[in-house]
Amino acid sequence: MNIYNVIMAGGGGTRFWPISRQKTPKQLLNLSGVDTLINETIDRVNKLSHKDNLFIVTNKSQRELMKETVDDKCHHNNILSEPIAKNTSAAIGFAAINIMKKYGDGIMCVYPADHYIKLEEEFLDSLEKAIE
């Protein structure tokens, strides 16, 4: 069974103001000193499956910026723009529909783009157990 990783990255950048804004939302900030939160999330979840199975859900206004930020870590045609920003469940449903149309059945793991995971190995072990 294929594993599809979905990263939700459509936040407007208002909750972390004044550091983040609409043009530089939190997921595009480098808070760890290593990389942006979105790129750290991509690096983490791509250990579970191939980058072909990685999808990012964002909003229309941030799609181009997201493509620049993630560069070659995610296929640009897998960066999905929500037609209308609604909420978390709508973003998950939007990703699920796109994945089902493209690939059919599989396991979809959903992650926020802006979380800091200190114990990465433990996190990945937990995900692998859940997938089994």
Task: Describe each region flagged by the PLM.
Residues 1-7, 15-18, 22, 33-112, ...:
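Conserved N-terminal catalytic core of the sugar/cofactor nucleotidyltransferase
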Residues 131-132:
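Conserved donor NDP-sugar-binding/catalytic core segment of glycosyltransferases
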